[in-house]
Regions:
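RNase H-like, Mg2+-dependent phosphodiesterase core
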Residues: 1-192
Length: 192
């Protein structure tokens, strides 16, 4: 990597849940930026992630966050939706090199690397994971305010026992991903 090369890193939050959006974030820092508090978002408390969100957005040279609705995920599938969002951010990034967390970007017209467990190995991928997770968690809290009986602020849309019980009791909402097994099953049984 030459001394003038700049790198952007991309990660996502929300591939596994059965409700809520997919959020993909990209971030670019000044070369040599470091911060020991930034870590894989899954290893941090909600309070630490929130504080780091502000730090990251203030310190970044550039960042972008995309929120992709459930209907798009259902139409295209989660893998394709994730890859297309990462490609969009990668194209927009004012950089020469792009790192992604375990997602190949073969059609990208920039140098790229897919890093397995990148949010554990790269500070900038970890920063992108924090931006994505905080944005998605905030979205799920708003859904929880609209539909408190579903418990979205607790399970964040993942198919927990409590979430499946809420689906059984109250039915499928627009925010549920109809292409995901538990929701498909519910639609077939109850025809919501």
């Amino acid at each position: 990597m030459g001394s003038t090369s700049r790198c952007s890193s991309i990660d996502e939050a929300g591939r596994g849940p059965i409700a809520g959006p997919l959020v993909v974030a990209g971030v670019c820092f000044e070369k040599g930026f470091t911060n020991e508090m930034i870590d894989d978002s899954k290893k941090l408390t909600e309070k630490k992630r929130e504080a780091l969100f502000s730090l990251i957005t203030n310190e970044a040279l550039w960042y972008q966050i995309l929120v992709i609705e459930e209907k798009i995920i259902d139409k295209k599938n989660i893998y394709r939706t994730t890859q297309e969002a990462m490609l969009e951010i990668a194209h927009n990034a004012p950089v020469d090199i792009v790192l992604s967390d375990a997602m190949p970007l073969p059609s990208l017209d920039k140098e790229w690397e897919s890093v397995i467990k990148g949010d554990q190995k790269s500070l900038s991928i970890a920063a992108a994971s924090i931006l994505a997770k905080v944005t998605r968690d905030r979205y799920m809290k708003k859904l929880d305010e609209l539909y408190p009986m579903y418990g979205f602020s607790k399970h964040k849309g993942y198919p927990t026992k409590a979430h499946i019980e809420a689906l059984n009791t109250y039915g499928v909402l627009d925010c549920h991903r109809r292409s995901y097994g538990p929701v498909q099953k519910m639609l077939e049984i109850k025809l919501f």
